[in-house]
């Protein structure tokens, strides 16, 4: 399937998920496993009931084989996410501090490791949805303050930036064209004024 032209420079959701699965996460192995060398990485020696950091994709494989429990990130709790939601409301010009892949990580863990989470899945989904919608409204309001040279996206995640990109790039291109035209007209007007002044002196 050929994507629309305005989406061809964007990452696909599956690509963002793939990138997110390379994030390190803590697991609690249920069995001891010897070190495994892989292309580009290796799984360290795992001891039963001893916490270890591994890429998320490794954790998901071990989890599916009932060989480990996943220790959820500290931010993936109802209490923490509600605090970030309140921050979003209190600070309309700022985005709260969340991990680069918080949306994808939370989605993966809610689907693949719900039994390892400390809070009920439905409550987590609800607060994540509220938080995401609030940030989306703020980011769309921010588009109104675009200028020809930059946009402030501090605090947005990869998925959030990827969703905004099809709207931001065309708008910035138009603004840049308007800016260049204005600058060109200003220079031409200045040149004309200098020529007129020179003609007056000659007279």
Curated annotation (Swiss-Prot):
Pfam families: PSF2_N, Sld5. GO terms for biological process: chromosome segregation; double-strand break repair via break-induced replication; nuclear DNA replication. Belongs to the GINS2/PSF2 family. Component of the GINS complex which is a heterotetramer of SLD5, PSF1, PSF2 and PSF3. Its main location: nucleus. Keywords: Chromosome partition, DNA replication, Nucleus. One of its GO terms (cellular component) is CMG complex. PANTHER family: DNA REPLICATION COMPLEX GINS PROTEIN PSF2. The keyword Cell cycle does not apply. Signal peptide: none annotated. Gene3D superfamilies: 1.20.58.1020, 3.40.5.50. InterPro entries: GINS_A (IPR021151), GINS_bundle-like_dom_sf (IPR036224), GINS_Psf2 (IPR007257), PSF2_N (IPR056784). It is found in: Nucleus. This is DNA replication complex GINS protein PSF2. CDD domains: GINS_A_psf2 (cd11712), GINS_B_Psf2 (cd21694). The GINS complex plays an essential role in the initiation of DNA replication. Has a role in chromosome segregation.
